[in-house]
Design a protein with these regions (language model features):
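Terminal amphipathic alpha-helical/low-complexity segments used for targeting or macromolecular assembly
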Residues: 1-36, 41-48
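Structural signal for interior beta-strand "rungs" in well-ordered beta-sheet cores
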Residues: 30-111
Length: 111
């Protein structure tokens, strides 16, 4: 029987996401509906971070303590400092730095 390489890749990706989500949860990140949140291997979280459903973290994202990421946000190459609120529907692109106590509202794109 022939192997289905595409199915193998999809299963590998699914399992790697599960490992990353479980690691975040074990470290105290509040992932609401974790199966809908996608992380990069290098995503880092501070303490008391909450992530709502349907958020995608691309490479090189750091999220500081007490931050809140709302649904349908897409974040890559961004440093989020402490007490920051993002989204919903925010698009944070490479090079974005959000300083302490910042708020990025809905349908905002940064670069």
């Amino acid at each position: 029987m022939k192997r289905n390489i595409k199915l193998d890749k999809a299963n590998s990706y699914r399992l790697s996401q599960e490992v990353l989500r479980n690691k975040a949860l074990a470290n105290g990140v509040n992932l609401i509906a974790p199966e809908t949140i996608f992380l990069s291997a290098d995503t880092t979280f501070g303490k008391n971070v909450t992530v709502e459903p349907y958020v995608v973290f691309g490479p090189k994202v750091k999220v500081g303590d007490n931050s809140y990421i709302k649904s349908f946000s897409n974040i890559e190459g961004t440093k989020i400092m402490k007490n920051v609120s993002v989204g919903p529907y925010a698009r944070l692109r490479e090079g974005t730095i959000l300083k302490n106590n910042s708020k990025i509202g809905n349908f905002v794109e940064t670069k």
